[in-house]
């Protein structure tokens, strides 16, 4: 199994849904439309020759300044063929939404929740899309590029008096 | 503190009582089993046989805060975990002490961001800070020794001593 | 796969109880509990002592590592990777370094490759020792904890010899190693290898045929191979179900294809098989370390960082002699190297499972996005599937056998 074989198989069925193909450093990645993303993942999993049954990684990326702004990246691995392929799908503001892979791959559950929590991308069809890493009442999505890092000024001897006067130290 | 406080300042009687009470407290201080992150592994290493902590009477790590008197905050405290730390501290009975082990507990460490409380002294009052990332078991033992010395200096009136500030730089450059 | 796989959330267990369901009891196994696996909160739905459902609530150690790495240059971000899976920091370093090196497309010298394999396998042994110690401690076999930490101290001494730090070494940098191996490295490792296989025999003597251990672990927490793959369970947990998938053999990195070792595989997918698989993995790691030590001895001294001066700095003495070296040094220190635009994903076999690192570069010295596929985070999803119908005490053994590290789960 190599990049060309799987690319040919996908092009045969989803030629209309493939928006971009990229082969970088030996890894194949395809950008799909949302409909094609779900269908391609199902095809790759169920086809007996391809057998990409293991969803290795699912995450989101915020490309601030680009349209579409967000991208969800899923890496599928075929344990039998020892090969990996990357599916990407873009989604845009104001309500970025992408089909969920959880009905196909139960392992996507936590990973999609994490992407929702940190980036705000919603997943259609996810059984329970709630925050996972941050407290439930947190406002905002920290991994977005327009969310600040939230760092505190570093205290040196010349400014420590000012900083420590404002820090909420506990005395009892 | 009860009867010792009411006995007032009876000179040599209360001084000896102070020494005895403090000696008793230092020699069998039971830590709360409270490892959060990487420093917890070094704390476990300090508990293990190579850097034995049980020679200081700290062999028993109590899981229940009601039975512990020392809370070693070992690891980074995230914003979700901070109320839990405070609640555990509140559940510990007096007298209680807190060691902030590691850079993350002392000042937020290398994680200067939205998710980590910048120093556990924003949540609980700390007695001794142990620096390191993670501090070696020997450094933790040094911190515990420093706490023992601090406890030995405690007065019966129960007033906590003010923190010892180092105002001059440690190395004089001429 | 008989019943459908569900991964419950705490709200799904708590809300019906609040609404008035009384047949089952909801119990909180809070973030602070006497099991050294970290700050994991479990919400249990119990029918007496039997677990009907269990939902992990994670996030109590969320550190924002991925966001913080975006504000540091590539090389500076290496220290943050140590703190994720804090039982195997060198594995995290290796994964991140391999991902960025793939982006940069640099050659790593042979000596650095062998040292990476050697130290990663030592790290695997030390991580499995902590697993063994804490797992046994959870099931009240306390002597094993002390024995395991005795060996671990020896390994940590080796790490300290090499990098100066016992745990958070940050020894694998992008482009090779941080410093060259010291001259007494090989004798120290050989001293360790002289004792190690017999110590593993000691642990096995205590536990493998122990009727109490067998009673607690055989047939408990069974998962079949198909569910395991569907749930994304990896590492020794997957191999215990019979699937012989190890990234070191399937998609080798750092020269693993040139070492001879086996992949231990279990049969039933219960806790006992996971225990046997990890013990066997320790033995295989000792074998790999032996081979790597021999190779290092044969290879002799050599460079430990790539010769690509745009990535790794030149040796300090060259700066006074060559203008080019000075400029490279200056650019690397003030700006950092700039990988080409693109993204790369690399996965390695960490002691917990498949650790992956996805790096996106926009051509600037700081990474645009770094994401870690944390094995413990994904392995936790299978907890509900494995724990249904078991008792609470089995749940404790189950968590220990999954070997989660909360730093990695929450990042």
Curated annotation (Swiss-Prot), chain B:
Its Enzyme Commission number(s) read 7.1.1.-
Alphabetically ordered keywords of this record = 4Fe-4S, Cell membrane, Iron, Iron-sulfur, Membrane, Metal-binding, NAD, Quinone, Translocase, Transport, Ubiquinone
Which cofactors are named for this entry?
[4Fe-4S] cluster
Alphabetical GO CC annotations of the entry are: plasma membrane; respiratory chain complex I
- What parts of the sequence cross the membrane? none
One Gene Ontology term from the biological process aspect of the record: aerobic respiration
Please name the GO terms that the record assigns under molecular function: 4 iron, 4 sulfur cluster binding; iron ion binding; NADH dehydrogenase (ubiquinone) activity; NADH:ubiquinone reductase (non-electrogenic) activity; quinone binding
Q: What does this protein do?
A: NDH-1 shuttles electrons from NADH, via FMN and iron-sulfur (Fe-S) centers, to quinones in the respiratory chain. The immediate electron acceptor for the enzyme in this species is believed to be ubiquinone. Couples the redox reaction to proton translocation (for every two electrons transferred, four hydrogen ions are translocated across the cytoplasmic membrane), and thus conserves the redox energy in a proton gradient.
What protein name is recorded for this chain?
NADH-quinone oxidoreductase subunit B 2
Q: Which organism is it from?
A: Chloroflexus aurantiacus (strain ATCC 29366 / DSM 635 / J-10-fl)
Instruction: List the gene name.
Output: nuoB2
Curated annotation (Swiss-Prot), chain C:
Which Pfam family, an example, fits this chain?
Complex1_49kDa
Lipoprotein among keywords = no
Q: Which UniProt keywords apply?
A: Cell membrane, Membrane, NAD, Quinone, Translocase, Transport, Ubiquinone
Q: Which domain of life is it from?
A: Bacteria
Q: What class of enzyme is it?
A: translocase
Catalyses which reaction(s): a quinone + NADH + 5 H(+)(in) = a quinol + NAD(+) + 4 H(+)(out)
How does the record classify its membrane topology?
Peripheral membrane protein
Alphabetical GO CC annotations of the entry are: plasma membrane
Which GO MF terms are attached to this record?
Answer: NAD binding; NADH:ubiquinone reductase (non-electrogenic) activity; quinone binding
Which EC number(s) does UniProt give?
Answer: 7.1.1.-
Q: Does the keyword Translocase apply?
A: yes
Q: Where located?
A: Cell membrane
Q: Which InterPro entries match?
A: NADH_Q_OxRdtase_suD, NADH_UbQ_OxRdtase_49kDa_CS, NDH1_su_D/H, NiFe-Hase_large
What is known about what this protein does?
NDH-1 shuttles electrons from NADH, via FMN and iron-sulfur (Fe-S) centers, to quinones in the respiratory chain. The immediate electron acceptor for the enzyme in this species is believed to be ubiquinone. Couples the redox reaction to proton translocation (for every two electrons transferred, four hydrogen ions are translocated across the cytoplasmic membrane), and thus conserves the redox energy in a proton gradient.
Its subunit composition reads:
NDH-1 is composed of 14 different subunits. Subunits NuoB, C, D, E, F, and G constitute the peripheral sector of the complex.
What does the sequence similarity comment in the record state about its family? Answer: Belongs to the complex I 49 kDa subunit family.
The protein's name: NADH-quinone oxidoreductase subunit D 2
Organism source for this protein? Answer: Chloroflexus aurantiacus (strain ATCC 29366 / DSM 635 / J-10-fl)
Q: What is the lineage of its organism?
A: Bacteria, Bacillati, Chloroflexota, Chloroflexia, Chloroflexales
């Amino acid at each position: 199994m190599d990049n060309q074989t799987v690319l040919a198989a996908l092009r045969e069925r989803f030629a209309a849904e493939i928006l971009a193909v990229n082969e970088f450093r030996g890894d194949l990645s395809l950008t799909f439309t949302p409909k094609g993303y779900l269908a391609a993942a199902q095809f790759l999993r169920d086809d007996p020759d391809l057998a990409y049954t293991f969803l290795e990684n699912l995450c989101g990326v915020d490309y601030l300044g680009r349209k579409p702004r967000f991208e969800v990246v899923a890496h599928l691995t075929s344990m039998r063929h020892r090969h990996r392929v990357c599916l990407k799908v873009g989604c845009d503001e104001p309500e970025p939404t992408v089909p969920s892979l959880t009905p196909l791959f139960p392992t996507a559950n936590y990973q999609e929740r994490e992407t929702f929590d940190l980036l705000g991308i919603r997943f259609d069809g996810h059984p329970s899309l709630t925050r996972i890493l941050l407290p439930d009442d947190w406002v905002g999505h920290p991994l977005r590029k327009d969310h600040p890092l939230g760092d505190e000024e570093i205290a040196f001897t010349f400014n420590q008096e000012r900083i420590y006067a404002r820090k909420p130290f506990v005395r009892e | 503190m009860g009867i010792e406080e009411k006995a007032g300042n009876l000179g040599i009687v209360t001084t000896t009582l102070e020494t005895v009470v403090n000696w008793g407290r230092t020699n069998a201080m039971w830590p709360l089993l409270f490892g959060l992150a990487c420093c917890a592994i070094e704390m476990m290493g300090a508990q293990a046989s190579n850097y034995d902590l049980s020679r200081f009477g700290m062999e028993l790590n109590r899981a229940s805060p009601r039975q512990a008197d020392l809370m070693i905050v070992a690891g980074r405290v995230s914003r979700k975990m901070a109320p839990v730390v405070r609640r555990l501290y509140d559940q510990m009975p007096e007298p209680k002490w807190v060691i902030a082990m590691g850079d993350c507990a002392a000042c937020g460490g290398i994680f200067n961001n939205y998710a980590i409380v910048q120093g556990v002294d924003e949540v609980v009052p700390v007695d001794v800070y142990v620096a390191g990332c993670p501090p070696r078991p020997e450094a933790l033992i040094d911190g515990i020794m420093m706490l023992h010395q601090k406890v030995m200096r405690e007065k019966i009136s129960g007033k906590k001593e003010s923190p010892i500030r180092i105002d001059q730089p440690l190395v004089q450059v001429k | 796969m008989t019943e459908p796989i569900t991964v419950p959330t705490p709200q799904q267990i708590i809300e019906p109880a609040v609404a008035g369901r009384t047949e089952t009891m909801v119990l909180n196994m809070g973030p602070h509990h006497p099991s050294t696996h970290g700050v994991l909160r479990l919400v249990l739905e119990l029918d007496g002592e039997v677990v009907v459902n269990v939902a992990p609530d994670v996030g109590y150690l969320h550190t924002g590592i991925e966001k913080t790495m975006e504000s540091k240059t590539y090389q500076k971000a290496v220290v943050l990777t140590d703190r994720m899976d804090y039982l195997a920091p060198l594995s995290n370093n290796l994964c991140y370094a391999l991902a960025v090196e793939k982006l940069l497309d640099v050659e790593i010298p042979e000596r650095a490759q062998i040292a990476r394999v050697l130290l990663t396998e030592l790290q695997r042994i030390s991580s499995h020792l902590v697993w063994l110690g804490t797992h046994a401690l959870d099931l009240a076999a306390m002597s094993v904890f002390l024995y395991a930490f005795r060996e671990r101290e020896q390994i940590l001494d080796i790490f300290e010899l090499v990098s100066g730090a016992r745990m958070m070494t940050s020894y694998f940098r992008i482009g090779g190693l941080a410093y060259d191996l010291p001259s007494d490295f090989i004798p120290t490792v050989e001293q360790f290898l002289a004792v190690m296989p017999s110590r593993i025999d000691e642990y096995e003597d205590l536990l493998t045929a122990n009727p109490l251990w067998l009673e607690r672990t055989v047939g408990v927490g069974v998962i079949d191979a198909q569910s395991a793959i569907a749930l994304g369970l990896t590492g020794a947990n997957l191999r215990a179900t019979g699937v012989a998938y190890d990234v070191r053999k399937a998609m080798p990195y750092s020269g693993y294809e040139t070492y001879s070792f086996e992949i231990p595989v279990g049969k039933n997918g219960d806790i006992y098989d996971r225990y046997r698989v990890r013990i066997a993995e320790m033995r295989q790691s000792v074998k790999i370390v032996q081979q790597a030590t021999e190779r290092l001895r044969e290879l002799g001294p050599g460079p430990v960082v790539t010769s690509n001066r745009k990535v790794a700095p030149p040796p300090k003495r060259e700066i006074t002699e060559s203008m080019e070296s000075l400029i490279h040094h200056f650019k690397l220190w003030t700006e950092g190297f700039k990988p080409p635009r693109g993204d790369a994903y690399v996965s390695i076999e960490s002691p917990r499972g498949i650790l992956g690192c996805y790096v996106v570069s926009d051509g600037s010295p700081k990474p645009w996005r770094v994401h870690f596929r944390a094995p413990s985070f994904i392995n936790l999803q299978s907890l509900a599937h494995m724990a249904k119908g078991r008792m609470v005490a089995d749940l404790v053994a189950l968590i220990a056998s999954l070997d989660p590290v909360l730093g990695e789960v929450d990042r």
